[in-house]
UniProtKB/Swiss-Prot annotation:
Residues 110-169 bind DNA. The lineage of its organism: Eukaryota, Metazoa, Chordata, Craniata, Vertebrata. The N-terminus interacts with the LIM 2 domain of zyx. It is found in: Nucleus. This is Homeobox expressed in ES cells 1-B.
Length: 187
């Protein structure tokens, strides 16, 4: 055997025991470690700590239970986020608690309640939009005081109105092109 191979084999024989930082040790997969000598490590596995109802620390978690003797069947269920939230709320809370939780959840997501504009507010905003689709801060603040709204709601309304105008313009351009192409094809 060559000296290099002898050195390599001696290094393999004198290899230190696996580190406690190894992936196998961290995941709890190393079978070689002695249970009595190693300290007990409790891994964070919330799916094991849950009760049968799926409630942990006041939070509702729906945990699928799979029977070992049955083949696993996966069905694609497409629900909207709103439907999923509604189902979870129905399972976890009573009627009066559900509304409170939904409001808190909306606040947590950073959402605010939708602003309902009156007809008169919309008419005034539309009139200003026809004159100037990009009003400055002074105009928006004046509108806010007249309409009893927040200035940021006015700003968002103008952004949404410009997007709506752009979308309708794009759709009308598409229809013009479509009509001209269909007339050329018929000729």
């Amino acid at each position: 055997m060559s000296p290099a191979l002898q050195k390599g084999s001696s290094l393999m024989e004198n290899r230190s025991p696996p580190s406690s930082f190894s992936i196998e040790h961290i995941l709890g997969l190393d079978k070689k470690t002695d249970v009595a000598s190693s300290p007990i490590i409790k891994h964070h596995r919330p799916w094991i700590e849950c009760s049968s109802k799926g409630v942990v620390n006041g939070t509702c978690w729906q945990i699928p239970v799979i029977a070992c003797d049955l083949p696993i069947q996966v069905h694609a269920v497409h629900r909207s986020e709103e439907e999923e939230t509604k189902i979870r709320l129905e399972k976890c809370f009573g009627d009066e608690d559900r509304l409170t939780y939904k409001r808190e959840l909306s606040w947590y997501r950073g959402r605010r309640p939708r602003t309902a504009f009156t007809r008169s507010q919309i008419e005034i905003l539309e009139n200003v939009f026809r004159v100037n689709s990009y009003p400055g801060i002074d105009v928006r603040e004046e509108l806010a005081s007249k309409l009893a709204l927040d200035e940021d709601r006015i700003q968002i309304w103008f952004q949404n109105r410009r997007a709506k105008l752009k979308r309708s313009h794009r759709e009308s351009q598409f229809l013009i092109v479509k009509d001209s192409l269909s007339s050329k094809i018929q000729e």
